[in-house]
Amino acid sequence: MTENPYLQTSTQPAAAGQTHILDETECWRLLAENSVARLAVSDDLGPNIFPLNYLVKSQVLFFRSAPGSKIVSLTQQPRVAVEIDGTDGGKRFSVVVRGDVRRLNDDAHIHESTVDTLPTMTGSDKWNYFAITPRQVTGIRFRTSR
C-alpha cells in the first residue's frame, strides 16, 4: 500500500470553537449582501456547477439565464443547491441554500422580483427568469490560517 503523501502536510483539525454554525437570519444577511454564487444542478451526466449572479427578495433567490445546458438541467431536475462564500469580519463563511427552482413566466412576478434588472456577469442577454424557493438554508463561519 502506498503512503499518502498529503498526510504529512495536512493541517490538524480546527480547534474547538473555531467553526461556528450560522443561524438562518445570519445566512440570509450574507446572502442579501452578496450577489455571486455557484449553482449546483444534476442531470443525466451527474452533478454540474455554474457561476451565478442572483438577488434575494422575501427569502427567495432570483436569477436569469441564457438558453443552454443550465436551463436543460433545471428542467430535468428542479432540485438545486446554491453556495456562496467569502470573508466577513475577518473570518471566512459559507452559506448553502438547497431548494426547488421554478421558471418565472408571469411578467408581473418578474417585474415585482426585479430579476429583470439584475446585471449579468457576461453582459449577454438573458431572458429566462428563475426563482429558487429554499427547503434548507445552512451556513458556517470559520477562521483560517491564511
Language model: regions and residue ranges:
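Extreme N-terminal tail/first-helix region
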Residues: 1-32
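A short, compositionally biased
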Residues: 32-35, 76-77
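Short beta-strand segments
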Residues: 34-66, 82
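Short, surface-exposed beta-strand-loop junctions and turns on beta-sheet-rich folds
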Residues: 45, 69-72, 146
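Short acidic/glycine-rich loop or secondary-structure boundary segments that cap or lie
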Residues: 49, 62-64, 71-72, 91, ...
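General beta-strand recognition
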Residues: 60-62, 131, 138
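Short, structured beta-strand-loop surface elements
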Residues: 67-134
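Short, charged, intrinsically disordered terminal tails
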Residues: 138-146
